[in-house]
Amino acid sequence: MLRHPKLSPYARLRKYFEGLVQVAEKKEFRGGCLLGNFAAELSEQSEMIRARVSKGFSTWSAMIANVIAEAQAEGQISKDLPASTLAAFVLNGWEGALVRARVDKSKAPLEQFVKVTFAKTLAP
């Protein structure tokens, strides 16, 4: 979805996260994010796993940052902060919302994340 050629960068980002909400709901909020799970459970026990999880988050954040930068270039997202900073913040927020959704067995935290992220954090 992040590379969909017919959607604007902003629309691609929004649809991407809305799709992740649907996946979490379909899985009944079980399992969560593999990277997040490894980070929480194993990063202190294995330096190799910690390094790979860190690289995974960096790669994911860079993918999001690339789309944010496109949206900034098109005036769809403010240029007040670097795309990399916004992407890291958005990804960290998503991971927190996903943990809360798992605990509450509810999509409300994920929907709140999407609403606030796209109304405020990634606003023009």
Ranges and model annotations:
Residues 9, 31, 49, 79, ...:
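Residue-level recognition of alpha-helical structural elements
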Residues 12, 27-48:
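Amphipathic alpha-helical segments used for helix-helix packing
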Residues 5, 45-49, 57-83, 123-124:
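Hydrophobic alpha-helical bundle segments that form small-molecule/ligand-binding pockets
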